[in-house]
Amino acid sequence: MRLGYALVVFLILGCASESQPKPNGYLRLEYPIPTYVPFTSLTNFSMEYNSLSEVKVRNQAIPKIVYPEMKATLYLNYATVNNNLDSLLNDAYKLPYKHISKAESIPEKIFINERNKVYGTLFSVIGNAASQYQFFLTDSIDHFLVGSLYFYAQ
């Protein structure tokens, strides 16, 4: 009987401690210092890309950049501006909003480089959407580039 009382007292006192919350854990991602390789397509389009990625040329010599270690692909589309900047901008703004049914929000970040006269917008598609980032860049006179970044994960 004494053993029963001692066991009950021990259980009550032993379980009275407050639980400690677990600290937040963060990923420690380390990437090598990037080195860049020049690329020129058959169209009026040239760029530099990361040497850890692979450039695969699609139709009309427009590349897609594959990052195998990250399971990511950056799809690019280039267009020459021929008095159709409004149409190109409308299409570029419509593209991220095709994900609105799956996205929680789509904040925009404006990019302006006055020195090189390059302007654009980065769309962060937050939520369970196929593409996490989409963007466009233009000089408003000759060149218009649209990109979509896809991560392949289940």
Regions found by a protein language model. Name each.
Residues 15-72, 80, 84-89, 104-106, ...:
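N-terminal targeting sequences that direct proteins away from the cytosol to non-cytosolic compartments
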Residues 2, 40, 134-135:
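A general structural-boundary detector
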Residues 95-146:
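Signature of long, low-cysteine stretches enriched in small and polar/charged residues
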Residues 1-16:
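Sec-dependent bacterial lipoprotein signal peptides
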